[in-house]
Amino acid sequence: NFPAPRRGPRGGPRGGPGQDKSPDAFRDFYDRFFNERPNQKPKRGMGSGFVIDKEGHILTNYHVVEGADEIVVMLESNGKEKEYTATLIGSDSKTDIALIKINRKPGDNTEFPFLELGSSENLEVGEWVVAIGNPFGLSHTVTVGVVSALGRSIGAGPYDEFIQTDASINSGNSGGPLFDMNGDVIGINTAILGKGGSIGIGFSIPSNSAKKVID
């Protein structure tokens, strides 16, 4: 059950590093590596995320939902996809984290399957990790790699201590979970280093950092 927020008519798509010009620190970092032209036409974008409680709160990246007029979430249950709209509850551009909530119809008491944030404190270089997301709109894609480095600074902002991994991360993976081999969410996939897609250098926000923001 991994949502795919989609951007409304303003602004451009988000996936790995974003494409629009903006003064915030994350966008400045992205623009150094992705010198895209400003958007000329309204577009939609896709990203990833994951449900963190039974009420339908979803954790994702700020750049996935930034400026969206509408957020649409796709959830799969028993092999069938169901579409919901969602509301932005809060966001922090400095850490690139956003919290959205699925809009349920009156009388709908659906309890959503969810993932709990684990601890990234004891993560070690060389540990196996699994990334799940929606790269290029290919939902529920699973890739495997290792932790390549910890506390990696990439010049993205004031809170700049990423998990580096060689698990394949591409445009559309942003906001998706990074798991350890115990099945705990230890990171939020956020950025890649490379213009054309994954080159084995991806970055995830540690789960402990995300906890501090959403708490």
Language-model features: locations:
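Serine-dependent protease modules
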Residues: 1-215
